[in-house]
Amino acid sequence: MRNKITSVIAALGTAAIMSTTANAGTLDDVKKRGALRCVVSTGIAGFAYPDKSGVWKGFDIDFCRATAAAVLGDAKKIKAVTSTGKTRFTKLNSGEGDVLWRNTTITFSRDVGVKLRFHGVNYYDGQGFMVNKKLGVKSAKELGGASVCIQTGTTTELNLADYFHANGMKYEAVAIETNDEARQNYMSGRCDVYTTDASGLAATRSTFPDAQNHVILPEIISKEPLGPATRHGDDQWSDIVTWVYYATVTAEELGVTSANVDKMKSSKNPEILRMLGVEGNQGEELGLSKDWA
């Protein structure tokens, strides 16, 4: 009996330690640090890129700033942790970043195998192909024998192999790690084709001095639902990222903006009042301030 009691006490002690560790999660780390670290790309126009002053801007960065505003009360308190397709998950899971706001496809293997928790789709995309007009190609089904620039560690690798196999074509893969590397190889002629999400192709083409000479082919060969991710095992932080995302969607639906938010606190719409913390205790339930949204 004594041994059983000792075992129970030891188990309770272990549980208490684990509970303390779990409670000291990402939210506490971010608050203590005073900055939110967002895992982003190395640079994609329109999504995440540093301007001439080194200030990061873009679609993904805006969501990163929204998260910082909710958690720290200041959208400027962010740090961009740049990553390639191969390193993004390692940087998140190792703790180098707090949240992944990066053009990343939600997949079964990334959720279950890589242990990522996804928090909704903030951009629906699909894989496409870009070629120089002088190649004379009108369809992806005419790309047999082409050299193709493709980022490693992405869903585009398997999609590309499947598409060419299904259409009885062969290709030469030119492996690259960053969008900038793809741009350089494509522009130099090292590869005939660049394939990635269609949004990424459009963003990359917009940076070309001769953008009008490059065409994105009509075929979209995959479904790429993009969304933010956090590590498994921190439910509170997962809830925060999830509801920061949904708060931005709801705010857009209800017409709440940074310019009219103070006026909206006098709204007669109870949904707006709850979102802005005038009524209810949603912020408290998340471990944030009443006006977190």
Outline where the language-model segments fall.
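Extracytoplasmic small-molecule ligand-binding "clamshell" domains
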Residues: 25, 31-101, 286
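Cleavable N-terminal signal peptides
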Residues: 11-12, 22, 30
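Extended ligand-binding regions for polar small-molecule ligands
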Residues: 62-65, 69-71, 133-137, 141, ...
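Acidic, polar ligand-binding/catalytic clefts
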Residues: 65, 69, 73, 77-142, ...
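Sec/Tat signal peptide C-region and signal peptidase I cleavage site
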Residues: 17-24
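Bilobed "Venus flytrap"/periplasmic-binding protein-like clamshell domains
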Residues: 37-46, 56-72, 105-106, 125-181
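Sec-exported extracytoplasmic/periplasmic mature domains
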Residues: 31-35, 68-73, 93-97, 134, ...
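Bacterial N-terminal signal peptides that target proteins for export
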Residues: 1-9
